[in-house]
Design a protein with these regions (language model features):
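Glycine-enriched, solvent-exposed interface loops adjoining structured elements
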Residues: 1-230
Length: 230
């Protein structure tokens, strides 16, 4: 999909000799566009759930909520966490957007707000143990109790999409798409996001080359796509 998106972007930019963006600039804009759309899925999903709960959306729109949920699920991952003795905690996976569940072996570790963890520890009735562990999170670290738990902890989480990269070979002075390059990376979003990607990248490109017409075209396209999805 990334080559199709780039070809479309370049065709629109070059239509009236508006300017040019380099492959590195395209990749930078592509990364930001993918991240924006990825984060929008969570907002859209919550919005659709609220609409259904408030009976503002009928059952005919349930497929939209399902599609968004499936897209988010495609970024689900699991990782074993490595204890950091200096911090006394487990660092979150480097690519995690948010963590759904922490596990100690096969046991779910209960999340507790940091302000309440000391109350649990101070009581013999509620203090966490290896059968009923607990944790709180702070600055991308998970503090697990009892503190004797330092291994066998894993996270079920939603990861960020991998940064896209349009790779190329230079032929007669021009960059030509090279999908076989070792660092090639397509977008991880579904095909349905292609138009959104084009318009968002165009918006960044228009600002970069200082072409207001390109920015206005991109904004109009984004508004059209948002209307379709609402």
């Amino acid at each position: 999909m990334i080559n199709t998106v780039r070809n479309t972007v370049m065709a629109i930019i070059n239509k009236d000799n508006n300017g040019y963006i380099t492959p590195d600039e395209f990749n930078l804009f592509a990364k930001q566009a993918q991240l924006e759309i990825f984060e929008q899925y969570f907002y859209d999903y919550t919005n659709w759930v609220n609409k259904r709960n408030s009976r503002l959306a009928n059952d005919g729109y349930s497929d939209i909520q399902k599609q968004i949920s499936e897209t988010i699920d495609s970024f689900s991952d699991q990782a074993t966490l490595t204890y950091n003795s200096g911090a006394g905690a487990f660092p979150a996976p480097a690519d995690s957007y948010f963590v759904n569940v922490l596990l100690y072996g096969n046991k779910e570790i209960e999340y507790v707000a940091q302000t309440k963890i000391m109350n649990l520890i101070s009581s013999n009735l509620t203090t966490p143990n290896v059968s009923y562990p607990a944790y709180y999170t702070k600055e991308q670290f998970f503090y697990v109790y009892p503190t004797t738990i330092q291994t066998n902890v894993s996270a079920l989480y939603v990861r960020y999409p991998v940064d896209p990269k349009w790779t190329y070979s230079v032929v007669s002075g021009s960059p030509i798409f090279n999908q076989s390059a070792g660092d090639y990376q397509d977008f991880e979003l579904p095909q349905s996001a292609q138009n959104d990607l084009v318009f968002k990248i165009l918006s960044y490109a228009g600002v970069n080359i200082r072409e207001n017409d390109v920015v206005q075209f991109a904004m109009a396209g984004e508004n059209t796509e948002q209307t379709k999805q609402s």
